[in-house]
């Protein structure tokens, strides 16, 4: 029976292990990995590989991994080895990641596109497969004779069932500006993180309110007709979308959205765990990601973006005479927050980078607020409703239509006496 192999790659400095002071708040990657059932209701096996983020370990490793990307290539090869060691024809591949982990699984998908997925008896060639991918010259491009010959001789021809990422940042998942950025580009620029046709379903959760320059969003450009791609904007900064803050009300919205997408494709979750661990709240705390270091070194702010913020649905020049599509839209919870978070001490939620047509919810959806229970949206199988959040959630209800009166008939002359 076909199995599901799931890679869950966490962001920089993120781990599921306890630190001083107890267990760290889990990221969405940790929750996703813990929520996946090992055996489905029909007896299929689901095997999860969790990869902690780069920069874990000694203070030196934290510095090298967080700033310089140390360990990134090793992480990609480790994920690839997990798939090589476990894959059998017919198995489905699911790849999930947050932040630098998102870059990791995107690059992993690029490596599979270039070198294929090695058959188990050729696992000793993983280094060769990575070198072939790393070269990225005309001679070793995925469509080159050498790459095709390598895949045909040693690898499975596989497709990726689902590629899901939370706030994939930076063209390389690394700093992209200044001397350090140029060095990182020269060292890691070979990675292929574009969306190719061998990915069947791709989902990207993006943070509306992030404004740090190194955290430029890496938006997919969709070139494959018929490919299922959604890039959805959520309220919050980087970790409000990918998780890791004590208040997980906002990040759980992005998690529940991703789980629903994966469940619709067949991935099954432990309903008991999800009901305890996932608590969505559109009015959850929006954290300030500008740490003291970022505030002191204001050069990290994004001068290219208005008000230092991200551009949503940014117009892109045509390519080869064809429009470039990104399939971006804003999640419904943002509209809910626009209506809910409007009182002290937080004040109104009004991100200045929302497109004009989205800054105010459509008129037909604004006037009426009803409890979610009165109009609960349909959910994908395998993802139960989360437990009641701290604040009562509200759904936007349609504006009731006003009755239209028939035009009055012209008066008739009274009958003659």
What are these regions (language model features)?
Residues 1-417:
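Active-site- or binding-pocket-proximal scaffold segments within functional domains
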């Amino acid at each position: 029976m076909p199995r599901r192999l799931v890679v869950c790659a966490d962001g920089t400095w993120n781990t599921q292990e306890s630190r001083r002071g107890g267990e760290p708040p889990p990221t969405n990657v940790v929750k996703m990995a813990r929520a996946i059932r090992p055996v489905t209701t029909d007896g299929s096996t689901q095997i999860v590989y969790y990869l902690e983020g780069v920069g874990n370990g000694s203070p030196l490793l934290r510095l090298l991994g967080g700033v310089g990307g140390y360990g990134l290539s090793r992480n990609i090869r480790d994920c690839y080895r997990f798939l090589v060691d476990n894959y059998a024809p017919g198995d489905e591949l699911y790849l999930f990641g947050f932040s630098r982990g998102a870059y990791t699984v995107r690059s992993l998908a690029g490596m599979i596109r270039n070198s294929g997925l090695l058959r188990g008896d050729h696992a000793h060639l993983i280094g060769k497969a990575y070198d072939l991918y790393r070269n990225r010259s005309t001679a070793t491009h995925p469509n080159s004779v050498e790459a095709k010959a390598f895949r045909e001789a040693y690898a499975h021809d596989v497709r990726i069932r689902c590629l899901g990422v939370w706030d994939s940042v930076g063209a390389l998942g690394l700093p992209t500006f200044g001397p350090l950025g140029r060095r990182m580009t020269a060292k890691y620029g070979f990675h292929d993180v574009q969306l190719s046709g061998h990915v069947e379903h791709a989902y990207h959760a993006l943070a509306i309110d992030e404004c740090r320059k190194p955290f430029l969003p890496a938006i997919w450009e969709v070139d494959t007709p018929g490919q299922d791609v959604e890039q959805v904007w959520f309220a919050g900064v980087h970790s409000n979308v990918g998780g890791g803050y004590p208040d997980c009300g906002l990040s759980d919205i992005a998690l529940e959205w991703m789980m629903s997408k994966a469940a619709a494709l067949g991935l099954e979750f432990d309903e008991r765990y999800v009901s305890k661990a996932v608590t969505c709240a559109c009015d959850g705390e929006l954290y300030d990601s500008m740490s003291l270091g970022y505030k002191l070194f204001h050069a990290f702010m994004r001068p290219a973006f208005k008000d230092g913020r991200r551009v949503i649905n940014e117009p892109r020049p045509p390519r080869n005479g064809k429009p470039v599509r990104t399939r971006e839209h804003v999640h419904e919870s943002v509209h809910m927050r626009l209506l809910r978070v409007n009182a002290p001490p937080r004040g109104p939620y009004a991100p200045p980078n929302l497109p004009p047509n989205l800054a105010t919810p459509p008129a037909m959806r604004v006037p009426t607020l009803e409890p979610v229970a009165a109009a609960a949206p349909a959910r994908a199988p395998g993802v139960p409703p989360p437990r009641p959040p701290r604040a009562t959630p509200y759904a936007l209800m349609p504006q009731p239509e006003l009755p239209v009166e028939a035009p009055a008939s012209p008066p008739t002359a009274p009958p003659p006496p």
